[in-house]
Amino acid sequence: MKLKKPVFLYFLLLAGLAASATEYQNTNTDQFPLRIHPNGKHVTDNNGKPFLMVTDVAWQLLRKLTYADVVQYMDIRKSQSFNTFVLQLLPALPNQKNVNKIAPFQDNDINKPNAAYFDYLEKIVIAAKERDLVIGIVVSRKSWNVVFDSKKEDDWKNYGRFVGKRFAKYPNIIWIVSEEEYQSASQFSAIAEGLRISTENNNLVASLSTCSPSNLAHNAANRSDLKFVIPDSTVTFGEYETLTNWQKNSGQLSQQPFLISNSEFPKEITDQSALIRNQAYQSIMSSAAGFCHMSTIKNFYPTWKVNITKDGAEYIHHFVKILKGIPWEYMYPNHTPGLLPDSTDQRQIGTVSLTNNRLSMLYIPESKPVLLDLTKLRGNDFQIVWYSPRTGRRWTGASITSSTGALITPPDAQTGWDWILLVGARE
């Protein structure tokens, strides 16, 4: 039997979150700019409503897509429940131009921006705002080091100030500064400062890493509001392993919101749909602010219009639908040690719980029975609810009594299916 809406509210009432559930239903078009949640782990809209960031990587959008294609891309991703996309402001190489054959600077001098280049970006920002989409704009990149390194701190700051002022009136922008490409933090700090002092809306300023972030403290030299971790084609298998381990511990390590993209080595995988779906839920299990989806669409090859409906994004709508019924923003990883007695399950299954230990959510990457020690949760009687990330369907499971060996079985034994399991105290 499908879980009805009152059961959603039942779980929320148990958790003392009824007010939050009511707030979650409110709609307000004045949702930008985004803010940092008081818990320091997540993002909210401008009204304080939790904002699950569902982000698509669109690195080469400026270089490859005409305006008509940009609009088509946005409309497709919007229909798939994405609310954010990120792009590179600068072309991949200093000798390249945007789709209109315009370079960002005259003579590659960052003090001499080409107005037409930024005019085209503005059209895209406006189109995104009209669709209630957040646009993350990466303003610096490793391949441009030869250009930026020839300048001084004042030049970097002026560049950040110019870009920030040029788009100051648009609250749907998140500025992103690449933080790992430099031997020192000076360029990051100067560009970020220029962006911060020129914005009218206090837009978030984020940082971008392609590997595990090395410093997550609030007082780090590269101070940012939000961290994006998006591997690129140069990341090695070993670095992916390090990134995966970092993600498993990031709920404790990170002191600010973060989004992580595909943290498993994908080069030998033809169909990445299952991997991407797995990564989306593992991100939430790591206490991320959402999920950053990355596929070959980021390069906008000639086949992108065909592939955009089958690149793993077909499951994102279910991802958003499922999480809207769960107080994910109040749940934290590793809060109920011992809930999974089996050591293999501990390695494979992601778990988050409310701090009062009355509700836990588990992501089970394969269809199999799961052994739970319910004495690690608060309560005597528990309600089970299942969700299928593959189909979006939900089931009401059994009511069970607390015990050290509760064996919970998925409602449909489909080979290769993954599952979301909710376990909530009834009393």
Language model features: what each stretch is:
Residues 1-9:
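Bacterial N-terminal signal peptides that target proteins for export
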Residues 8-11, 278:
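Sec-dependent N-terminal signal peptides
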Residues 12-20:
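Hydrophobic h-region of N-terminal signal peptides that target proteins for export
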Residues 21-80, 358, 372, 377-396, ...:
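Non-catalytic accessory regions flanking glycosidase/transglycosidase catalytic cores in CAZymes
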Residues 24-238:
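Active-site mouth of glycoside hydrolases
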Residues 26, 266-267, 272-398, 409-427:
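Aromatic- and carboxylate-lined catalytic core of secreted/periplasmic carbohydrate-active enzymes
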Residues 172, 178-311:
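Extracellular glycoside hydrolase catalytic/binding regions
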